[in-house]
Curated annotation (Swiss-Prot):
The keyword Glycoprotein applies. Residues 43-139 form the Expansin-like EG45 domain. Disulfide bonds join C46-C70, C73-C134. May serve to lubricate the movement of the cellulose microfibrils during cell growth and wall extension and/or may serve to maintain the fluid state of the slug cell wall. Keywords: Disulfide bond, Glycoprotein, Secreted, Signal. This is Expansin-like protein DDB_G0293186. Glycans are attached at N19, N117, N391. It is found in: Secreted.
Length: 421
């Protein structure tokens, strides 16, 4: 008897451990992240209960996709670590919320400070992100609602349901009522799924069955009688983590993989300053023109370049909010010329460096510097500098500032793909 109890406890303990793990269910991607004050106090546009054990996030309009990602969980990786958040809301104010190039996560300052430093910067432009299972314990919860007659629920013609505490995102919800000739697919409305009687169609009668399809193709069925309106009901079902239902080596590899920060965009500057880069912290200069047209009609140049006049011991300092990973940088290349000639121009990544370029003059010179000569020993850095280490004023023209990466640099696309086979 004692042995049986121990076995049961072991099984329950294992089940709890599995559910509390955030299984990786997509490839790694690159995104942007900003802090937004205190933690959310409601369920946002999705209308979901707050998860409590993890933080919440809002997504830009494109990524939120009319609520299709409500309740999904993502692991976010910044310069100081990782945290898991659940999508509960969308944002539509400002350029970051309206752009379609990247996922833009808006999270609480508390969660932001788990992965970055909100006192030092207000964005992480090289965020790593990955879809994960939410790791909730227990089963999926449902809240029903719809029409009413004389103050009593009547779902004959109109019916809606919302779900919470699901570990895998919900792709589709279907309904089959008693007497119905076919299954009806419910329409998603943010965090709710609605059914309306079509003209001449059958009324909803009970018992009925809901069929939930997860983003990985899993299906759960829940048979129920007429439910009370507005009350949370435990459906006694839960999506299984991918590794519990699949022997695919690819899925297993993805579930073990931890994402790093997102890969840097190739260019710091090409026709314009790359997203996330600023020159605010440059020092001892007379001017910085990021849209100079003084290309001298060189074939490899575009229409614009950087023109800067540095005083003696002045620096052109490119800063990237939220930092960037240096691990996979192979080299830095750019095109440059100077007037008067300069033999003391240093280039370095991070706060200090000592690599000095060959003497530069009026003719355009294409430079490639191995990363080992300019980067620090830190895995994460925040800046790139061109430093005039001499007491004379120089004008520099610089274009096509580009990072080159090692062959083993993992790709981090802007939009991740679920890894289910």
């Amino acid at each position: 008897m004692r042995t049986l109890k121990l076995i049961i406890l072991l099984i329950l303990s294992t089940f709890k451990t599995i559910n509390s793990t955030n299984i990786k269910i997509s490839e790694c991607g690159k995104a942007r992240c900003v802090p937004n004050g205190e933690s959310s106090t409601d369920g946002g546009q999705c209308g979901l209960p707050l998860p409590g054990v993890i933080g919440t996030a809002a997504l830009n309009v494109f990524a939120f996709d009319k609520g299709s990602r409500c309740g999904e969980c993502y692991e976010l990786t910044g310069p100081l670590g990782s945290t898991v958040v659940m999508i509960t809301d969308g944002c539509d104010a400002g350029d970051a919320c309206q752009q379609k190039e990247l996922f833009n996560f808006i999270i609480s300052k508390k969660d932001f400070n788990k992965i970055g430093n909100s006192s030092a910067y207000g964005n992480i432009y090289s965020l790593g992100y990955q879809k994960v299972s939410c790791g909730f314990s227990g089963y999926i919860k449902a809240v029903f609602g719809g029409g009413s007659i004389a103050g009593r629920p009547d779902y004959s013609y109109y019916f809606h349901v919302s779900f919470s505490n699901f570990n895998i995102g919900i792709k589709q919800v279907q309904l089959m009522g008693t007497g119905m000739s076919r299954i009806s697919t419910l329409k998603r409305d943010l965090g709710k799924y609605t059914w309306n009687q079509e003209g001449g169609g059958a009324k909803l009668q009970f018992p009925a069955t809901l069929i939930l399809t997860g983003i990985d193709g899993q299906t759960l069925s829940y048979k129920f009688n007429k439910p009370p309106s507005g009350q949370m009901i435990d459906i006694k079902k839960q999506f299984a983590p991918p590794t519990q239902k699949s022997s695919s080596a690819l899925v297993l590899r993805e579930s073990e993989k931890k994402c790093e920060m997102g890969k840097l965009p190739d260019y710091v500057y090409q026709e314009s300053l790359g997203l996330g880069w600023v020159t605010y912290f440059s020092w001892k200069f007379d001017y910085i023109n990021l849209e100079s047209h003084e290309t001298n009609k060189k074939a490899s140049m575009g229409k614009k370049l950087i023109q800067v006049e540095l005083k003696g011991y002045g620096g052109l300092h490119f800063t990237r909010e939220g930092g960037f990973q240096t691990k996979y940088i192979k080299s830095l290349s750019f095109t440059i010329r100077a007037a008067p000639p300069i033999s003391a121009l240093q280039v370095y990544v991070g706060q200090v460096g000592s690599y000095t370029l060959p003497t530069l003059g009026w003719q355009w010179t294409e430079i490639t510097i191995p990363a080992s000569k300019i980067k620090s020993k830190n895995d994460i850095e925040y800046s790139l500098s061109f430093y005039n280490n001499k007491n004379q004023t120089n004008t520099l023209w610089i274009d096509n500032i580009k990072w080159n990466f090692t062959p083993d640099c993992p790709p981090t696309p802007a939009f991740v793909t679920d890894k289910f086979i």
